[in-house]
Amino acid sequence: MAEPVTILGAGLAGCEAAWQLANRGIPVTLWEMKPDKMTPAHHSPLLGELVCSNSLRSDQLENAVGLLKEELRRLNSLILRCADTHRVAAGGALAVDRMAFSQAITEAIQGHPNITLRSGEVKALPEEGQVIVATGPLTADDLAQDIARRFPAGVYLHFYDAAAPLVTFESIDMDSAWFASRYDKGTADYINCPLTQEEYLAFWRELCAAKEAPVHGFEDKNVFEGCMPVEVMARR
């Protein structure tokens, strides 16, 4: 019988790892601290929760991101299967219905005979057995400290991110806005809202002066240049 594997964290990486191992006949125990322990960034008890954007980036084979997705599909990826099933219109990108996507992942994991899902916080790395750590940037403090203790010479990376804002369709004046594709790729799934120079400058000034959401205790504002909050971009 194959040696069991313990996986810590049931986000995208943890769920995919559990799925791939389980499909190969390897027993998996998958630990997830939600819903027993939530963080300020979590809003759902479901597995595979998207805490930022609902876009999984490009789905075009002409670039590396899209090519990796196609390779994952051919490897029976759970994440890509659920994303394709619950995708929403986004031109050349792969975007999903957040809740339906996570619900599908949760049901697949819960229904797999080789996966045992455990709810609760793991405060230290298991001392025995094969273990995959997939707790991501929202790792609980005790486990993060245990990892740091075991790897004292490690370099700990982080960056400040923000949840993508949601705008209701009813709030947009479609007499002025129009649908178009993004970068002239795919279908016309994006709403374009035009501004005159005067309107743009007024918007920019208001954005720079706008009140910000309070920073959580575990965050600092070391932003990632490739995924920058719009207010930080405006102030530059």
Predicted regions: what they are:
Residues 14-16, 141:
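Short glycine/serine/threonine-rich phosphate/pyrophosphate-binding segments
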Residues 64, 69, 91-125:
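A structured beta-alpha segment of the ubiquitous adenosine-cofactor-binding alpha/beta core
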Residues 61-65, 69, 77-92, 151-161, ...:
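A short alpha-helix-loop-beta-strand transition element characteristic
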Residues 19-81:
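N-terminal FAD cofactor-binding segment of flavoenzymes
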Residues 2-13:
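Beta1/beta-strand and adjacent pyrophosphate-binding region of the FAD-binding site
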Residues 4, 27, 156:
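Residues at the starts of beta-strands that form the adenosine-phosphate
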Residues 59-64, 87-104, 135-142, 191-198:
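Short beta-strand to alpha-helix junction loop
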Residues 108-236:
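Predominantly flavin-linked oxidoreductase catalytic cores and closely associated redox partners
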